[in-house]
């Protein structure tokens, strides 16, 4: 299974902790390494990473990861990284003509989530998004999280400002290449370059599924508070395993 990781953003709210957000260490392991490790555990064997802000440093790190782990990592440049995240997804279009896992470099997660998505490849018509139905999840930043309204395992609405919703977007997707066309349509017709814009197009076509994560761990490391919460959570896991 191929995997696309978006690592192009600036991460301005974490500049005090790291120059390049994907390289920020959490328990001495860079965020993007944690994402790659979880994907490997889930069965991914071919990586594509879109870099942008501070791309030279991220590229150098990924080249070392590729050598040390003996895994293929294709690095894709996005010189329009200031635009919405859908642009980063589109930069990978020439490389991906089959189903792929889509991940964010700053979203760490239990590998079981990705594994379950991969096992659902045969039923995917557009995208399947892993969603968190725990609306009281203390690791979620309510000011920034993307909200999702799901009915009968189909996405009906998605966006940060939704007033009516029943789960959260974890940033972990199983995608068919039709997603690229959907983002292009959203950009052209709605002037919306975001990944969520593409998902909305697919939702209208009945091609946007949802998979509950049923309590599995995930966290969007978006600011110092999220970072501290994730650090505490991982510390508790280490203590349990000791």
Residue ranges of predicted features:
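Conserved alpha/beta core of the MobA/IspD/sugar-nucleotide pyrophosphorylase nucleotidyltransferase superfamily
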Residues: 1, 166-242
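N-terminal nucleotide-binding beta1-loop-alpha1 segment
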Residues: 1-17
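Conserved N-terminal catalytic core of the sugar/cofactor nucleotidyltransferase
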Residues: 2-5, 29-99
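Alpha-helix/helix-capping structural signal
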Residues: 9, 53, 112, 177-178, ...
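Phosphate- and divalent-cation-binding pockets in alpha/beta enzyme and binding domains
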Residues: 13, 57-60, 85, 112, ...
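Conserved beta-strand segments of alpha/beta enzyme cores
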Residues: 22, 72-74, 154, 207-209
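Conserved beta-loop-beta/alpha segment of the NTase-like Rossmann-fold superfamily
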Residues: 66-145
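Conserved core of the sugar-phosphate nucleotidyltransferase
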Residues: 110-186
């Amino acid at each position: 299974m191929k995997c696309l990781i978006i690592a192009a953003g600036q991460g301005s709210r974490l500049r005090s902790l790291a120059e390049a957000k994907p390289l920020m260490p959490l328990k001495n392991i860079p965020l993007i390494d944690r994402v790659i490790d979880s994907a490997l555990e889930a069965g991914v064997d071919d990586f594509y990473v879109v870099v942008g802000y501070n791309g030279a440093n991220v590229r150098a790190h990924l080249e070392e990861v590729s050598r040390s782990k003996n895994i293929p990592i294709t690095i894709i440049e996005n010189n329009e990284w200031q635009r919405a995240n859908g642009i980063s997804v589109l930069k990978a279009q020439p490389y991906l003509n089959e189903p792929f896992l889509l991940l964010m470099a700053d979203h760490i997660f239990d590998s079981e989530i990705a594994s379950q998505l991969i096992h659902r490849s045969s039923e995917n018509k557009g995208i399947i998004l892993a969603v968190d139905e725990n609306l009281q999840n203390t690791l979620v930043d309510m000011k920034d999280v993307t909200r999702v309204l799901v009915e009968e395992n189909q996405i009906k609405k998605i966006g940060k400002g939704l007033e009516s919703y029943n789960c959260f977007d974890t940033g972990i997707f199983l995608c068919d290449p039709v997603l690229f066309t959907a983002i292009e349509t959203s950009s052209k017709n709605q002037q919306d370059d975001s990944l969520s814009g593409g998902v909305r197009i697919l939702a209208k076509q009945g091609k946007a599924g949802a998979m509950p994560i049923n309590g599995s761990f995930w966290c969007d490391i978006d600011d110092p508070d999220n970072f501290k919460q994730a650090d505490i959570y991982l510390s508790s896991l280490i203590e349990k395993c000791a």
